[in-house]
Structures are given as structure tokens and as C-alpha cells.
């Protein structure tokens, strides 16, 4: 196996034929998944895409979702106000702001993508279900509240429905630091008797969320904490850089061993979130799928190495600059085999998007999912657009058809929605994508950015009545 995520020939897995058919901010972003009143009209939005147009031009990448959803809770640890820059306009950020405000913090808009957060007035240490259910990353409030106050009560998290993603490793880390964790009816109560104490933490598996939560909890603990088998993702390094800019002593972030010497005081800071590698990769794939030519700006090319490696094997031309990459296609797309891995391997968050691209390639491609559960839920929707994909467990075999056809589809999670956007852009005809609140969780103004590249895309409101069969129709 190579670290860039490409499967060697000997690692390919046969797929059973029997499974062939298995099936902006500050209050302006409203979550479409929120429950409404009994008599209210259940409105939502959909994207309507007329495909077949090449994407051309430049696109600016926003701040990293996976970094900012940990950095915002981390401001709880500060003993002074913090300024956070390059904040993406996504619904997950608005949820973080809502939770901070509910806890007692103030969130003040300073300029586009820039906010001042003052958490010194926090009096509540509880994050209720109605807030936590909207975002899986709400669990970072556990580490931040516990690390600063020695107590928290946080509901089990929500977010994308990607199968069994327990928080046992998070609780293991807290326990190692001296906390007592109790789970009762979906609420997690975490307390300490004499404060948190530094300790050695070894994770049973590589886990991004637990690594970041352990950092949050340990940064003010008494003594030295050593985290082994730590995840290495760029957003972990960004969280550590943010905390270090406040006076924390975190060493080794980005390696599998992180050392944290606890401090008593963290000053305020002004810090810019890193660019989003997954958003960058998504636009890179969209450019390739449409045969376009796009300059993807405000990126860190080193964070894109595994994505670039795989795309080049598929036949995509990529030019790298200091803080940008240019994506173009000069010839046919070709098959490849990929396995997702923790960083620096090919990211699971790019797997659905690259699958959509491989539907347009020549030959048989294979993808083995090595990180997430149920990451292939989008496959049935791509099949509606003419994709030939067989799934057996954690392996998908894609027979490149060279073309896709527009169809009505639904996003089942964030990255699945991105894959359907890419497929719709490349397809012949019109594609409508519903449940786009998933997409808006992690992509800032995707509609506007794509339209600026030449895409024919429109956001339209839909109502429940559109999904109710008429009297002469079968309910199905």
C-alpha cells in the first residue's frame, strides 16, 4: 500500500454479484432539518443544476470546517477574548456560535469571516440535545468545558449519519486524565474530583475527534500528557497552533505522538483558520469532471498531496503554486484503485467525490473504504444518474460509463451531497438535489462559487406539497 491511497493489485477485493443492487452567518443560515410547528409549511431548498458546462475561472477556498468546529469551542479555554479569522460561512459554524451564546459567551462580528469571541462570562456547562443533535462536532464542547471548568454535561452528538461512530475513545481520554464519565439517556456527564492530571493516553484506533478532544482537555491539566497513536490531520495541527498562540505548550501535533504540558493561563489571540483541504479537493474534482480549467486559490498544496496524487493517476493535470493549484484535463480519464486512510493517506471525506469522477473514467475502478462506516450511502443516488457501481461491504467497484444523466436525487450526508453536485455538473440534462442542508453544513456558498465558474445552478425553495402524491398517483 502506498500512502497516497492507491491500492496495489494484490490488495484488490472481489465484489459479490449478489450485492450488485444493494441499495450566510449571523442568523442568515437556517437549518433545514429543524423540526417545525404542527401547522407550519415544511419548507426546504434544493439545487437545480443544468449540467454539461465546463467550469472555468478561479475559486477561493474558505476556512477549514474540520478545524473551525474545534477552534471555536477552544476559545472557552481562553482567559481573554479571542479573534478568529477566515471563518467559513457554513451552518456548522452558526451552530457553534449558538452553543457558545447559550453557554454565556459573546460572539461579535468584526468583518467578513472575522469574529471576536469572549467566553469569560460563561456560567453554563451544559449543551442540550436540541443543539448537539445538529452537529457531530458538538462533542468538542466536552473537552473544552471539561478542560476549563472541570465539569460538563453534553448531549451525544448528531451530524452526518455515517454509521456507528462511537465516542468511547473520547471518554477513555477524559478518564485517563482523571475525569469520571457517565452516560445516561443520551447525556454525557463528566466530572473531576481534584482537577485533571496529565497522563499517558493510547488510542485503540486512529481517531481525529478523540485526538482533538484530548488536546482540549489536557491543555490546562496539571503535568504532562502524552497522546500516542494520535491522528495527524491538518486540522489537528491547526487546533494545536491556535492553542499554542494562546500560550499552550503542545508539541508533536501532526505526528502520532503528541505531548502537552499543562498551563494555568491562556491569553487571548488573533488567529486565522487554515484553508479547507476537502473543499479544495471538491472543487478540484468538479473542475476535472466537467473537463474544465480552474485555479483553486487559498490552499496549502502540501495538505492536498494525496488528493493530487490520485487525481493525476486518473489523468487530471494539476499545476502547483505557493498557495494555489490549477486543475485541467487534456485527455481521457482513466481507471484507478484507491483505499482511504487516515492522513497522510487519501481522505475518506473525498471518497464520494472521487467516486463521481471515476464514473466518467474509462475502465473498472475500485475504492476500498478504510476509515468510515456506511460511506457508500450515496451510491444509489449516483445509480439514478446512470452510474454503474457495485458495493460489497467496504468496497465499491465502478464501471466507468463515460457519461451521467441528470435526475432527481437526495443528499444523505455532507460529502455525498458534494458528490451529487459534481455528478450533476458533469451530467447531461437537469439534476435536482434535495436535502441540501447537508451540503450547507460544510461548504460556504457553494452555489455562488460554482456559478462564478460558469455552472448553471440555482437554489429553489420546495415545500412538503411537492412530495405528496396527487390523488391519481401511486403513493409507492
Language model feature labels by segment:
Residues 2-476:
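Short, structured segments at the rim of ligand-binding sites
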Amino acid at each position: 500500500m502506498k500512502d497516497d491511497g492507491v491500492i496495489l493489485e494484490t490488495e484488490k477485493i472481489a465484489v459479490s454479484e449478489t450485492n450488485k443492487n444493494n441499495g450566510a452567518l449571523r442568523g442568515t443560515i437556517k437549518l433545514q432539518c429543524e423540526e417545525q410547528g404542527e401547522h407550519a409549511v415544511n419548507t426546504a431548498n434544493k439545487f437545480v443544476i443544468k449540467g454539461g458546462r465546463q467550469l472555468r475561472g478561479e475559486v477561493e477556498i474558505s476556512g477549514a470546517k474540520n478545524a473551525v468546529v474545534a477552534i471555536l469551542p477552544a476559545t472557552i479555554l481562553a482567559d481573554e477574548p479571542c479573534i478568529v479569522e477566515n471563518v467559513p460561512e457554513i451552518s456548522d459554524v452558526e451552530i457553534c456560535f449558538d452553543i457558545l451564546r447559550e453557554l454565556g459567551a459573546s460572539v461579535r462580528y468584526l468583518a467578513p469571516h472575522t469574529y471576536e469571541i469572549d467566553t469569560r462570562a460563561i456560567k453554563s456547562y451544559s449543551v442540550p440535545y436540541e443543539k448537539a443533535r445538529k452537529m457531530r462536532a458538538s462533542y468538542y464542547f466536552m473537552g473544552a468545558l471539561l478542560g476549563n471548568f472541570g465539569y460538563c454535561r453534553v448531549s451525544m452528538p448528531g451530524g452526518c449519519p455515517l454509521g456507528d461512530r462511537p465516542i468511547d475513545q473520547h471518554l477513555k481520554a477524559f478518564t485517563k486524565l482523571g475525569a469520571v464519565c457517565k452516560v445516561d439517556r443520551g447525556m454525557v456527564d463528566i466530572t473531576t474530583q481534584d482537577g485533571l492530571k496529565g497522563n499517558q493516553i493510547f488510542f485503540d484506533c486512529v481517531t481525529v475527534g478523540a485526538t482533538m478532544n484530548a488536546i482540549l482537555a489536557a491543555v490546562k491539566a496539571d503535568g504532562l500528557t502524552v497522546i500516542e497513536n494520535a491522528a495527524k490531520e491538518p486540522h489537528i495541527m491547526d487546533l494545536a497552533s491556535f492553542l499554542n498562540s494562546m500560550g499552550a505548550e503542545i508539541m508533536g501535533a501532526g505526528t502520532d505522538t503528541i505531548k502537552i504540558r499543562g498551563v494555568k493561563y491562556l491569553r487571548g489571540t488573533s488567529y486565522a483558520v487554515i484553508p479547507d483541504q476537502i473543499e479544495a479537493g471538491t472543487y478540484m474534482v468538479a473542475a476535472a469532471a466537467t473537463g474544465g480549467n480552474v485555479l483553486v486559490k487559498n490552499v496549502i498544496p502540501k495538505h492536498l498531496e494525496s488528493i493530487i496524487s490520485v487525481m493525476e493517476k486518473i489523468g487530471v493535470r494539476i499545476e502547483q503554486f505557493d498557495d494555489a493549484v490549477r486543475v485541467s484535463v487534456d485527455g481521457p480519464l482513466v481507471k484507478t484503485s484507491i483505499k482511504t486512510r487516515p492522513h497522510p493517506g487519501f481522505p475518506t471525506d473525498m471518497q464520494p467525490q472521487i467516486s463521481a469522477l471515476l464514473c466518467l473514467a474509462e475502465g473498472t475502478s475500485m475504492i476500498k473504504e478504510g476509515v468510515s462506516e456506511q460511506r457508500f450511502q450515496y451510491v444509489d443516488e449516483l445509480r439514478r444518474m446512470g452510474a454503474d457501481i457495485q458495493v460489497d461491504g467496504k468496497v465499491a467497484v465502478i464501471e466507468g460509463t463515460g457519461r451521467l444523466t441528470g435526475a432527481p436525487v437526495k443528499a444523505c450526508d455532507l460529502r455525498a451531497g458534494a458528490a451529487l453536485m459534481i455528478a450533476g455538473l458533469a451530467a447531461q440534462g437537469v439534476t435536482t438535489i434535495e436535502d441540501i442542508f447537508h451540503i450547507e453544513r460544510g461548504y460556504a456558498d457553494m452555489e455562488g462559487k460554482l456559478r462564478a465558474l460558469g455552472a448553471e445552478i440555482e437554489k429553489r425553495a420546495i415545500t412538503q406539497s411537492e412530495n405528496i402524491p396527487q390523488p391519481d398517483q401511486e403513493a409507492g
